[in-house]
């Protein structure tokens, strides 16, 4: 709990900045956090803002009262994190601050500790098929229907026999961390019959590599009560997000180059050559949820539909 207490003091003492450094640091201002939250709620209706129906909320004056935190309830968790680890045979290496990467030799571990940038790139490279679909792209009925069919096919491939005793549910919260200027995730778990999970039980759903370094037991900071949760420490979020943003930019740039080459062969003029291929700040939380799954592999975050 000492770590939690120190974290709370740091949150309290860190000054708020309203100057955007999103593209250079991967950090967000409170205003950008609200924009990203609005986009997440729009694209994924299972997420919502806290609204005005909470009488026990501890408000932060730099955020709108109705947008203090994001919440999605009763997210299923069918398997413990250890089930996912057992299927992996690759080694992992520590990249500092609790993050670990797969497939590295002992020699690479030593050199990796000296190269923070390559560590973050390797962590980001573990996230496959990173694609963001803009609003206008997701409105096409045919494409959306095909995406849904693909998702259902993937779900069929992953069907396993789940015993009721192993099924759990989580309420997930995302709030703004003033000390790191990034989103911060909190998890509150429940057994299948609705009984709150103990901290030790919730830690069973955190990937083993992250339990002692990245996850912290602490009360939900935005409630006046003492509701215990497990938080995901945000110390590396900004750096990893920077790498993921570059990954999105490179992917879009390649796609645009391919389209431009096709247009050139067909004598079409490329009217989109000056479009920025980077990640928009309002799309930040969609990518954030994508890499949070490396910490909570069994929790079925709602990030795989319209926004990808």
From Swiss-Prot:
Disulfide bonding pattern of the chain: none
Keywords: Autophagy, Cytoplasm, Protein transport, Transport, Ubl conjugation pathway
One protein family per Pfam: Autophagy_act_C
Knocked-out gene: effects: Impairs the formation of preautophagosomal structures.
Subcellular location(s) per record: Cytoplasm
GO molecular function: Atg8-family ligase activity
Bias (Basic and acidic residues): 106-120
Active site residues per record: 235
Region feature (Handle region): 239-283
Region Disordered, residue ranges: 89-121
Region (Flexible region): 83-159
GO cellular component: cytosol; phagophore assembly site
GO biological process: autophagosome assembly; autophagy of mitochondrion; glycophagy; nucleophagy; protein transport
Listed InterPro entries: Atg3/Atg10 (IPR007135)
Subunit structure: Monomer. Interacts with ATG8 through an intermediate thioester bond between Cys-235 and the C-terminal Gly of ATG8. Interacts with the C-terminal region of the E1-like ATG7 enzyme. Also interacts with the ATG12-ATG5 conjugate.
UniProt record similarity statement: Belongs to the ATG3 family.
Entry domain remark: The N-terminal region is involved in phosphatidylethanolamine-binding and is required for ATG8-PE conjugation. The flexible region (FR) is required for ATG7-binding.
Further remark: Kluyveromyces marxianus proteins are shorter in length and have a more ordered secondary structure than their S.cerevisiae counterparts, which might contribute to the superior thermotolerance and solubility. K.marxianus could be therefore useful as a new model organism for further elucidation of the molecular details of autophagy.
Function: E2 conjugating enzyme required for the cytoplasm to vacuole transport (Cvt) and autophagy. Required for selective autophagic degradation of the nucleus (nucleophagy) as well as for mitophagy which contributes to regulate mitochondrial quantity and quality by eliminating the mitochondria to a basal level to fulfill cellular energy requirements and preventing excess ROS production. Responsible for the E2-like covalent binding of phosphatidylethanolamine to the C-terminal Gly of ATG8.
Protein name: Autophagy-related protein 3
Gene, per the UniProt record: ATG3
């Amino acid at each position: 709990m000492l770590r939690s207490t120190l974290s709370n003091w740091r949150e309290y003492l860190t000054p708020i900045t309203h100057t955007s450094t999103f593209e250079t640091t991967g950090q967000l201002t409170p205003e950008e956090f609200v924009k990203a939250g609005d986009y997440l709620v729009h694209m994924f209706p299972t997420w919502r803002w806290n609204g005005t129906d909470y009488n026990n909320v501890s408000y932060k004056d730099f955020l709108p009262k109705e947008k203090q935190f994001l919440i999605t309830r009763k997210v299923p968790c069918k398997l413990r994190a250890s089930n996912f680890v057992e299927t992996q045979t690759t080694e992992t290496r520590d990249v500092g601050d609790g993050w670990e990467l797969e497939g590295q030799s002992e020699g690479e571990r030593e050199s990796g500790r000296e190269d923070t940038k390559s560590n973050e790139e390797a962590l980001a490279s573990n996230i496959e098929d990173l694609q963001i679909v803009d609003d206008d792209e997701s409105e096409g009925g045919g494409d959306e229907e095909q995406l849904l069919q693909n998702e259902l096919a993937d779900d069929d491939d992953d069907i396993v026999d789940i015993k009721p005793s192993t099924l759990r549910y989580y309420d997930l919260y995302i709030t703004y961390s003033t000390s790191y200027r990034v989103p911060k995730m909190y998890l509150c778990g429940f057994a299948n019959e609705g009984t709150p999970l103990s901290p030790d039980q919730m830690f069973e759903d955190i990937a083993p590599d992250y339990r002692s370094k990245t996850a912290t037991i602490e009360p939900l900071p935005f409630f006046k009560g003492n509701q215990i949760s497990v938080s995901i420490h945000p110390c590396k979020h900004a750096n990893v997000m920077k790498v993921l943003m570059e990954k999105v930019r490179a992917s879009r740039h390649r796609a645009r180059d391919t389209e431009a080459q096709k247009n050139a062969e067909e004598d079409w003029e490329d009217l989109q050559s000056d479009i920025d291929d980077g990640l928009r700040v309002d799309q930040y939380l969609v990518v954030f949820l994508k890499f949070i799954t490396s910490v909570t592999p069994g929790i079925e975050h709602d990030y795989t539909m319209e926004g990808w």
